[in-house]
Every structure is written in structure tokens, then in C-alpha cells.
């Protein structure tokens, strides 16, 4: 089996832009394996030269040319990184010129605009949504639950918490979640805490076999992780969703990104930034 291809995400800020676009591209090659290295805040020539050394060392040690996804605004730093022995995709260099041509104006280049706290409204909306999701995780509180944009329901370990946090971080959505426990699943009614907010409910389900694997890691060889328990809980949860007309999605083969977009569309939610 061939060794994984080395991939470098290089950015003068957080690296999120390079990672997000790079991952979207690499995911189209599911038959290959990659080893990822992220280098954020490469914002000085010295840092850029240090990264170039690491990339070149990787080329020498692995015998394959690394792939580098670069999100750097500064021309000098980009020139230094270009000296690395790697196949490089530079997002600003690739797309900025095309956009300048289409808009018939030169960009006012600044490294402060992307992923910056300078955009106060965007930052505040994100932090408010994250705090809301954390305060309403796993049904811990119904205080101000009426302010939720969406309330995710599902059995334990069906993906509720990461989906809520992703919705909050990426879209500013106030997402709460409620775990369906055996008492809830045995009832014909909706859980008391979320019943007043039926129109905000969205269900998450999962294949029992996948659920068992996740639970087995958390509580090995417990009744909680038995396959018959998982099958029963998943079936009962889906019956509840159908009985009350609650839309739901299967998380088994969906990334959190795909799931979040699906929820936005199904619930007709609009991002806050």
C-alpha cells in the first residue's frame, strides 16, 4: 500500500479557508489517503521560510511532491512560499485577478478582512449562537428555549451536539438539542420540554450498526451499546418523528457540513451572517 500523500494548508490567518476548500477538493479522491499539516498565521517572511523548509523536508522524506493549499494575501510571503517544492493551489492568486477583471477594479488587499473580529456584528452573532447552543445542549435547560431557531432531537450519540455547534459557528443559528431517553421513546406524546416548540423540532436518526459502534467506544460491552438496544431506540425515535410529523435526516453517511445545509433548507432557516 502506498504511503499517504502529504498535504499542507498554509494561511496568513486561521487556515479555515484553505482547509474548507482544500478538503472539498480532496474529498473527490476517496480512493487515496492523505496526511494533513495545517500552518495558520504564516504572516511574516520568517514564518514563511520555516514552512517552506518543512514542505521541502516532507518532499525529501516521502519521495512524493506534497500538495499545498495556500490562502495568503501578502505578495512577499506568497513569493517565499512559491519556492517550496510542492504542487500549489493559491486561492488568492488564482481567483483575485479574475474577480478584479470582472468587477473592473483593483482589490484593496488587506489581511484583516477574513476571519477577523473586526467584523463586530458577525463575531457577536456567532458567539451568541455558540453560547446558546452550549447552554441548551443535551436538554440541560429549557430557559429561553423559545429563542431557538431549531431544536434537534435524537437518541444518544446520533450527532446532535456537533451539528448544533456547526450551525452556530458557521451560520449563527441558535440550535438547541434534546436527547430522547427510553421514557420519551415509550410515550406516545412528545417530551414535555420540547412539546411547546413542535414547529422548531428536527429529528436525527442513524443506522443501528453505526450507533452501536459509536456507543461501544463510549461504554464498551454495556446494555447501552448492545445492537438490540440501538435498533429498538432508533425504530422508536423514527416512529415518534413520523407520528408527530417531525422532519428528520439520517446522519450515518452525511458529514456535519452536509447535515447542516440539509437542516437549513428543510427548516427554511436563514443564516445570521
From Swiss-Prot:
GO terms for molecular function: ADP binding; ATP binding; phosphotransferase activity, phosphate group as acceptor; protein serine/threonine kinase activity. It comes from the Bacteria. Its EC number is 2.7.11.33, 2.7.4.28. ADP binds at residues 154-161. It is an enzyme of class 2 (transferase). It catalyses: [pyruvate, water dikinase] + ADP = [pyruvate, water dikinase]-phosphate + AMP + H(+); [pyruvate, water dikinase]-phosphate + phosphate + H(+) = [pyruvate, water dikinase] + diphosphate. HAMAP family: PSRP. Bifunctional serine/threonine kinase and phosphorylase involved in the regulation of the phosphoenolpyruvate synthase (PEPS) by catalyzing its phosphorylation/dephosphorylation. This is Putative phosphoenolpyruvate synthase regulatory protein. It comes from Neisseria gonorrhoeae (strain ATCC 700825 / FA 1090). The lineage of its organism: Bacteria, Pseudomonadati, Pseudomonadota, Betaproteobacteria, Neisseriales.
Amino acid at each position: 500500500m502506498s504511503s499517504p500523500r502529504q498535504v499542507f494548508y498554509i494561511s496568513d490567518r486561521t487556515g479555515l479557508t484553505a482547509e474548507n476548500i482544500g478538503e472539498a477538493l480532496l474529498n473527490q479522491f476517496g480512493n487515496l489517503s492523505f496526511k494533513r499539516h495545517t500552518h495558520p498565521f504564516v504572516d511574516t517572511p520568517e514564518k514563511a521560510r520555516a514552512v517552506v523548509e518543512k514542505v521541502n523536508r516532507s518532499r525529501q522524506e516521502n519521495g512524493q511532491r506534497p500538495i499545498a493549499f495556500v490562502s495568503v494575501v501578502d505578495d512577499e510571503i506568497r513569493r517565499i512560499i512559491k519556492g517550496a517544492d510542492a504542487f500549489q493551489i493559491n486561492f488568492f492568486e488564482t481567483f483575485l485577478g479574475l474577480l478584479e477583471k470582472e468587477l473592473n477594479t483593483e482589490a484593496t488587499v488587506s489581511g484583516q478582512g477574513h476571519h477577523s473580529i473586526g467584523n463586530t456584528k458577525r463575531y457577536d452573532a456567532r458567539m451568541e449562537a455558540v453560547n446558546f447552543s452550549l447552554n441548551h445542549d443535551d436538554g440541560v435547560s429549557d430557559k429561553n428555549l423559545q429563542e431557538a431557531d431549531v431544536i434537534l432531537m435524537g437518541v444518544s450519540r446520533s450527532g446532535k451536539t456537533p451539528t448544533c455547534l456547526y450551525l452556530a459557528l458557521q451560520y449563527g443559528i441558535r440550535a438547541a438539542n434534546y436527547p430522547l431517553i427510553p421514557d420519551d421513546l415509550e410515550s406516545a406524546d412528545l417530551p414535555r420540554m420540547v412539546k411547546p416548540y413542535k414547529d422548531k423540532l428536527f429529528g436525527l436518526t442513524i443506522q443501528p450498526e453505526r450507533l452501536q459502534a459509536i456507543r461501544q467506544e463510549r461504554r464498551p460491552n454495556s446494555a447501552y451499546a448492545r445492537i438490540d438496544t440501538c435498533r429498538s431506540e432508533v425504530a422508536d425515535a423514527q416512529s415518534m418523528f413520523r407520528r408527530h410529523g417531525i422532519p428528520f435526516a439520517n446522519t450515518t453517511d452525511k458529514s456535519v457540513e452536509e447535515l447542516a445545509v440539509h437542516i437549513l433548507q428543510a427548516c427554511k432557516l436563514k443564516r445570521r451572517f
